[in-house]
Structure formats: C-alpha cells, structure tokens
C-alpha cells in the first residue's frame, strides 16, 4: 500500500466504497510541523532546536478521526495544508525521531484494519510486506496546477510558481534524506497520473485492489 505525491490519492479514495480505511500519513508529519511552528521551534532558517522537537514528540496529542485530523482536540485538517506548513514539512519529516514516532503511530493505526496508507515511505519502510503497493507519479508542473486549484478553492492567496518551486524542493529533500528516503519499492506498480482524470486513476487502482483481494 505505497502511495505518493501531491493530491490525487485522497480524491481517489473519497470516490470509492471498498470498505477500506484511508490514512494520509503525510498529514501526520504536517501536524508535527504545525505544532513546531506554533511553538516557535521553526524559524526563518528552518529547524533550529532539535531538543525541543524531541520534547514536542513526547507531548504530541494526535487524534485521527473519520472527519479529519486533530491536534490537542482541535481540528487542524485545513490548517495543516497551508503554504507555511508545506514549506517546512520536509525538514521536519527528515528528522529520525519524528519518523520513528510517526511510523509507530501508523502501524498501530493499521492494526486489525484493512487499510490504504498514503505516504512516501509506506511500501519501503512502514509496510514492506503490504499486499499491494502503488507508486503514483505525476509531472511537477501538473502537481503544482492541482495544488494551486485546491488552495484557490479554499480562498488561499498563492502563486503557482511558488507552489511549483516548493514541490521541487520537497521532492529533492524527501528523495535524498538519510531517514526513509522517497523511493519506489521494487515490487510497487507505478501509475503516472499526469494526463489522467481522478476517475481514470480511481478505476485503475480499484482494478488492482480487486485483483489482490
């Protein structure tokens, strides 16, 4: 169950009824990033106090509910998608202690459930023995357009070039980091969504899931 890249899989999941529980693992790293921003642990130059990040993890209160993500009992589902979080999440996600904590939570969440996990290291680190691994890819420009439309619909004031540059930066950081780098699992099926509609991608994924049930 290895899924990757900006937007697409969440939309695919919302348009199906397979009886599977969906978890966007990237949102969990965004929650840690949001909390670090709120507590002033992240500055203009990025991460600056590793010890405080570790303390933050000890006190972290994440609640994954059917209607969204909660931090300290507050719904942060929209807030974690803001550009300031996107700009900093890859730096936070590269920290070993953060990844270890999130992977542990992801595995606990998946106990006794049939799940779809959406993330950048699911098939290589979190669940290397998953029943099905799908590696979604798309051209960076297309991903920037998708994210731009999504943020504009939410009333955000954003520039598409900034989104594009942020995507390139995140991809570089995520694919070269020491801890759980972004890469395709050897047994993953790659699906290029660049020129495909959500409906087309959904149907393709459904066919693969049904053939593995």
Where on the chain are the PLM-derived regions?
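Conserved beta-strand scaffold positions in the cores of enzyme catalytic domains, especially
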Residues: 22, 133-135, 188-191
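Short glycine-/polar-rich loops that comprise or flank the Walker A/P-loop
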Residues: 9, 128-132, 186-188
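Anionic, Ser/Thr-rich low-complexity intrinsically disordered regions
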Residues: 121-126, 134-145, 154-179, 199-200, ...
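Single conserved hydrophobic/aromatic residue that forms the stacking wall/gate
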Residues: 1-13
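N-terminal phosphate/diphosphate-binding loop that engages ATP/GTP or pyrophosphate donors
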Residues: 17-82
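Residue-level signal for inorganic ion chemistry
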Residues: 26, 73, 102, 116, ...
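NTP-dependent small-molecule kinase module
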Residues: 71-77, 86, 148-154, 173-213
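ATP-dependent NMP and nucleoside kinases share a basic, alpha-helical "lid"
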Residues: 77-154
């Amino acid at each position: 169950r290895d899924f990757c890249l900006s937007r697409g899989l969440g939309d695919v999941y919302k348009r199906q009824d397979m009886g599977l529980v969906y978890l966007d693992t990237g949102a969990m790293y965004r929650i840690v990033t949001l909390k670090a921003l709120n507590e002033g642990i992240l500055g203009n130059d990025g991460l600056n106090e590793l010890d405080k990040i570790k303390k933050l993890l000890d006190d972290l209160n994440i609640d994954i509910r059917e209607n969204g993500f909660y931090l300290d009992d507050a719904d942060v589902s929209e807030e974690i998608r803001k550009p300031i979080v996107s700009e900093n999440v890859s730096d936070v996600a590269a920290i070993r202690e953060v990844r270890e904590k999130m992977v542990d939570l992801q595995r606990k969440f998946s106990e006794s459930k049939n799940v779809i996990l959406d993330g950048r290291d699911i098939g290589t680190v979190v669940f290397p023995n998953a029943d099905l691994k799908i590696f979604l890819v798309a051209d960076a420009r297309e991903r920037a357009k998708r994210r731009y439309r999504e943020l504009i619909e939410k009333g955000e004031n954003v520039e598409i070039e900034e989104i594009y540059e942020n995507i390139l930066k995140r991809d570089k950081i995520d694919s070269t980091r020491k801890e759980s780098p972004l890469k395709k699992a050897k047994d993953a099926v790659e699906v290029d969504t660049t020129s495909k509609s959500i409906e087309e991608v959904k149907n393709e994924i459904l066919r693969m899931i049904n053939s593995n049930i």
